[in-house]
Amino acid sequence: MTDRLNIHRLTTETRNPQTASIHQADTMEILRIINQEDFKVAEAVQQVLPDIQIAVQFAHQSLRRNGRLIYAGAGTSGRLGVLDAVECPPTYSVSPDTVIGLMAGGADAFLQAAEGIEDSEETGALDLKTIGLTAEDTVIAIAASGRTPYAAGALKYAKTIGAKTVALTCNKHSLISTYADHSIEVVVGPEVITGSTRMKAATAHKMILNMISTAVMIKSGKVYENLMVDVHVSNEKLKERAIGIIQSITGVPYDKAKETLEAAGSHVKTAIVMLKTNSDETHAKALLKEAEGFIDKAIEQHVSKEKER
């Protein structure tokens, strides 16, 4: 058996001595055991914050160059990437191809497990070719084991193109880490149910992906204070949220916030700058464009220009 296939040496495949008798536990004890193990996940993530920071830097630079952040994974790992990617457009008003989640087997595999499809390195490379991977992109391959061929193939191909690459795994010295510019190896220990990496490993990866995409969007001016000022106003709930955001930042009454949001074409940042600078939509948009989308910079520029008059 090759070293690559000897999964029994992986931390994620070893037995957890704390859960060896879980089959004999009552319901509350089962839940307590799982909860106790889950506490270890956040601590493990804390240990790799410096590595996550580098991944954020890669992705942020890609977006500044009009590149993309691309997740690639199989099974649960692939689903996590898709989940993070699809939430970015409504939350931050980025286009659907700014953050992309690629999953072995495509959309069908998201709903129904297709375990065998992960064994093809060629498929990982092909999926990146299909979306036209460029050197401006950042690819984060996700695999709890650190040895999934689909993830390995994606990283190998991305390296040939010149894209920045990151391996996200739950095992030290993993195979896919050797194919990446940088790795995040978050060791959460053995699973509650041996080898069930949809549990602690997946939880850790979900936390890390949340951190990466959120930090990138903050650094891209999509957040002001702690508010999602680039929220895409696509339904009544989000419209009410947008009005609340405008009120919170500017202090205007509900009706004024609603009126300004409508005048700004439902663009929250424009409405905020309009109110903060007492300007119209055209001027507010020009200020935001000059400030690369950052509200505070747009307001500062306006104040500076007013002083020069």
Swiss-Prot record:
It holds the Pfam family GKRP_SIS_N. Residues 59-222 form the SIS domain. CDD domains: SIS_Etherase. It catalyses: N-acetyl-D-muramate 6-phosphate + H2O = N-acetyl-D-glucosamine 6-phosphate + (R)-lactate. The keyword Cytoplasm does not apply. One of its GO terms (molecular function) is carbohydrate derivative binding. The active site is at 87 (proton donor), 118. Pathway: Amino-sugar metabolism; N-acetylmuramate degradation. Specifically catalyzes the cleavage of the D-lactyl ether substituent of MurNAc 6-phosphate, producing GlcNAc 6-phosphate and D-lactate. A lyase-type mechanism (elimination/hydration) is suggested for the cleavage of the lactyl ether bond of MurNAc 6-phosphate, with the formation of an alpha,beta-unsaturated aldehyde intermediate with (E)-stereochemistry, followed by the syn addition of water to give product. This is N-acetylmuramic acid 6-phosphate etherase. The gene is murQ.
